Amino acid sequence: MTATPKPLVLIILDGFGHSESHKGNAILAAKMPVMDRLYQTMPNGLISGSGMDVGLPDGQMGNSEVGHMNLGAGRVVYQDFTRVTKAIRDGEFFENPTICAAVDKAVSAGKAVHIMGLLSDGGVHSHQDHLVAMAELAVKRGAEKIYLHAFLDGRDTPPRSAKKSLELMDATFARLGKGRTATIVGRYFAMDRDNRWDRVSSAYNLIVDSTADFHADSAVAGLEAAYARDENDEFVKATRIGEAARVEDGDAVVFMNFRADRARELTRVFVEDDFKDFERARQPKVNYVMLTQYAASIPAPSAFAAGSLKNVLGEYLADNGKTQLRIAETEKYAHVTFFFSGGREEPFPGEERILIPSPKVATYDLQPEMSAPEVTDKIVDAIEHQRYDVIVVNYANGDMVGHSGIMEAAIKAVECLDVCVGRIAEALEKVGGEALITADHGNVEQMTDDSTGQAHTAHTSEPVPFVYVGKRQLKVRQGGVLADVAPTMLHLLGMEKPQEMTGHSILVAE
């Protein structure tokens, strides 16, 4: 290791895809002189961040968890979405020992099976087909009382698209002859990840005690009433459907989200005896199952155990005596640490982490710069003092403001990013450092939905930029994917890649 590291900085612009279309494209509408200059003067190209290229089903848009897993692993990582879907197709899901044990315990005691999760075809945190399969499993194993607690999307799907998903579940329960939708609530409340416990408590109290300001005879009627209150899917307030279906001691509760970050908080409320972030009216003693492991510290079993990834970038750098910094604001901190490290919570030796709090605003269109300037201050300081060999940073703006669907805010967000990238590039030039700029998936390059005319709030399957910033004479090869980024970094560091990394350097000599 050199005495004064000249850092290699990986800049991940979250949700910053590439599209030639100008319609609803915040990136092309924005003034971005720094990125324009880098595209003209530095080696750059496009790489894939979606579908089979990142271990998702063909055509499936990428997301932040998947993107960071692939970026850090240096290999295509077979995703939980694909694992669960395959298990359902193969029939293994219906024999899953963890789920079956919880359901069988409830059934033998004459208790209910509660299925909860994000009900949509977005495929980012969950998929509605998985919830259908869970209802089928419960019926096959003899459950008489089956209740669905549906979290509505409108973020990874169009803002008002939940009706068809609710109708799918109604049709499923009718076909099975058992089960019904018991509650609906927007993901804004049920799937927080920033310790906004007032939101989480409204979802928990709805599910456990049927406590709700709104009631409806059917899920679709409840949804239509929410639309009449001007609440899009994501923001639908707690609504009880039909008779109360309280969660009781001995019931089974299966959380069908496969993505961890937005499933942890609600899970903790259910299973932690010493939970103190808000006062629970009740904590029923249930047979709780997480579809995947949301965190190693959560005292509940998971149906699909986490697979371990060996020799991810962070581990390999540590084993070779390199120092590294991971930095992001709250919204993406888990991605640049836990997910980038292949599902590992603890830092590697020589790894430091900086968490910058995200602004406490209801939605990020109200503060589109988010905490990017503060993140950049810390990075520039680290570069100037040459403290680390490698710095990995995530800028949340493109994704989080992109999800708002508000074009003006998205333009401000990416213009802020341009300034931040410029500051990093300037600091690196002074010390002889290098950077790679890329993204985990698309979003902010498509802010309007061509087919519906509504705001487009979901991710896209567009390719993402890849830019080398430095003095070497290199060119970008075609056909790169996110899994090629870690091997590219090792190439720049003059290190052989470990055999577990199947990706290949995107940069080649001119």
UniProtKB/Swiss-Prot annotation:
GO molecular function terms attached to this record: manganese ion binding; phosphoglycerate mutase activity
What is this protein called in UniProt? 2,3-bisphosphoglycerate-independent phosphoglycerate mutase
Q: Cite the entry's keywords alphabetically.
A: Glycolysis, Isomerase, Manganese, Metal-binding
Q: Which residues form the active site?
A: S64 (phosphoserine intermediate)
User: Where is Mn(2+) 1 bound in this sequence?
Assistant: D399, H403, H459
> For this chain's UniProt record, which GO biological process terms are given?
glucose catabolic process; glycolytic process
Q: How is the cofactor bound?
A: Binds 2 manganese ions per subunit.
Keyword 4Fe-4S recorded: no
Q: Which organism is it from?
A: Pseudomonas syringae pv. syringae (strain B728a)
The cofactors required by this protein are:
Mn(2+)
